[in-house]
C-alpha cells in the first residue's frame, strides 16, 4: 500500500504534468515567439516540482518516525544515531525535567524532534535529507543516493 507521502507526491506530480502540457501547447500555438515568452511557466513548474519533492521528503521522514514508534516499544531499540540525536536534544533542553518527560513518553518526544527538524528543512538539498535519515533512522549517507 502506498504511503500518504507518495499519494500526495503523485497528486502534485499530476499538477506539474499539467504545467508541462500547458507549456507544450503554448509553445506550439506561439512557435514564433520562442521559449523566452514561456519562461514564467518553466519557472513555475520547476518551483512547484521542488516544493512537491520537499513535501514528499518531509512526509516520508515523518511517516517513517511514526512507523518506528508503532513497532518499537523501548527507546533502547532505536538505531544508535537516533539515540544520540534524542540524547543531545534532551541535554540541550532548558527545562530541567525534560529527561523525565522523555521517559514518560519517549515516542512523542522522538516524533516532535523529527517534526521540528523537518520544518527547518526549507530546501531539499541532498546533504540535509541524508542528515535527517542518519540522525533519526541510523541510515548513513552511503545508503541514500
Each language-model region and where it sits:
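Charged alpha-helical initiation segments
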Residues: 1-47, 59, 71-81
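Helix-loop junctions and short alpha-helical segments
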Residues: 48-49, 60-145
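Extended alpha-helical coiled-coil scaffold domains characteristic of the BAR superfamily
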Residues: 51-55
Amino acid at each position: 500500500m502506498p504511503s500518504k507521502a507518495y499519494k500526495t507526491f503523485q497528486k502534485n506530480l499530476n499538477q506539474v504534468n499539467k504545467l508541462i502540457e500547458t507549456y507544450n501547447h503554448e509553445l506550439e500555438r506561439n512557435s514564433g515567439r520562442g521559449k523566452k515568452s514561456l519562461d514564467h511557466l518553466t519557472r513555475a513548474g520547476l518551483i512547484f516540482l521542488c516544493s512537491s519533492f520537499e513535501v514528499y521528503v518531509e512526509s516520508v521522514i515523518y511517516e517513517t518516525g511514526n512507523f518506528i514508534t508503532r513497532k518499537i516499544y523501548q527507546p533502547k531499540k532505536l538505531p544508535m544515531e537516533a539515540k544520540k540525536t534524542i540524547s543531545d536534544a534532551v541535554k540541550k533542553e532548558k527545562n530541567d525535567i525534560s529527561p523525565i518527560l522523555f521517559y514518560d513518553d519517549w515516542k512523542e518526544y522522538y516524533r516532535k524532534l523529527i517534526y521540528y527538524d523537518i520544518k527547518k528543512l526549507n530546501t531539499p538539498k541532498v546533504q540535509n535529507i541524508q542528515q535527517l535519515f542518519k540522525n533519526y533512522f541510523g541510515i548513513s549517507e552511503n545508503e541514500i543516493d
